[in-house]
Amino acid sequence: PTRRSSDLQSIAAKLEDGSPCCEWIGPGGAGHYGKMVHNGIEYGDMELIAEAYSMLKKRTGLDNDGLGDIFELWNRGELNSFLIEITSHILHYKEENGDYLLDHILDVAGQKGTGKWSVMAALDEGDPLTLVSEAVFARFMSSLVNERERASVQYPSGKVGDMEACITLNTSGIEAVRDALYAAKLISYAQGFSLMRRASERNGWNLDYGTIAKIWRKGCIIRSVFLERITQAFTKSPGLQNLLFDAFFHERMENALPALRGMVVDCVFNGIAAPCFFSALSYFDGLRNFTSAANLIQAQRDYFGAHTYERTDSE
């Protein structure tokens, strides 16, 4: 096994310091599970980028070159990643006749099933992998071509009267979309690592989440500088319960949260579908809501099915 590991590491992608993006993850299918969650996160990343693109396209009036410039700029900062980079390339790409290729690609997104597997695993673990779930459902929605065509005719406008949108998409507004994307991305990764933590505890895998984030930093679809921060968070606190509890990410989330709320409101006001952004914000607000409405649900369950309940005022 040692020689085999050495052979694999010798041909693996390397980080800037030369360390390989190949490590032993754990026993009993732990590596396969981690790869599955990686692909689920990939679904979330791609859908969030697509939703940001949709919002910018509909609200700025920029052509594909202008939108490509935005993603190119974002790729120079904290959103630097393979997926942001190729999004810029795709937006800029023109065919020989001068048409943007993207505008001639049918908007039906295929899938191989790994996103669905992640969602199924989350259901089995009882873990709210809400953003990846919405990303999978968004691909299902894209396949409803006939229904979408009919609905676009019957309900041509989804705007809410003449209400002012929360985001004015000038330069500062575009920066707000960038910050909203960062916040939603953070929430998606927090959910993904939470799922791995639950599976690790149940299966006795003792996963090293800092190492997992490290080996994802090169040689894979979700490679990004963002993962370096995740590596640092788990290196500093291996038992970190949720990425949102890390000091750096806490500060970054506090700064980006107004942008996430603003983008969600803007999309609602203007009838723009952004299920993953909506889901990210709902998860965040649900997580920080110490007193939820689940007591009513439990009371309902007891009322019709005698499922019992726990009291808060007695043992």
Q: What is the predicted function of each stretch?
A:
Residues 254-255, 259-315:
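C-terminal amphipathic alpha-helical interaction region
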Residues 17-22, 27-31, 35, 39, ...:
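C-terminal substrate-binding/catalytic lobe of Rossmann-fold NAD(P)-dependent dehydrogenases
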Residues 7, 37, 146-147, 289-292, ...:
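Surface-exposed beta-strand edges and their flanking turn/coil or helix-capping segments
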Residues 6, 10-13, 42:
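Ligand-binding pocket scaffold of soluble enzyme catalytic domains
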Residues 13, 140-141, 286:
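Residue-level marker of structural boundaries
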Residues 1-5:
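Short, small-residue-biased leader/transition segments that mark boundaries at the very start
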Residues 9, 133, 278-281:
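Short, well-structured alpha-helical segments that form the helix of a local strand-helix-strand
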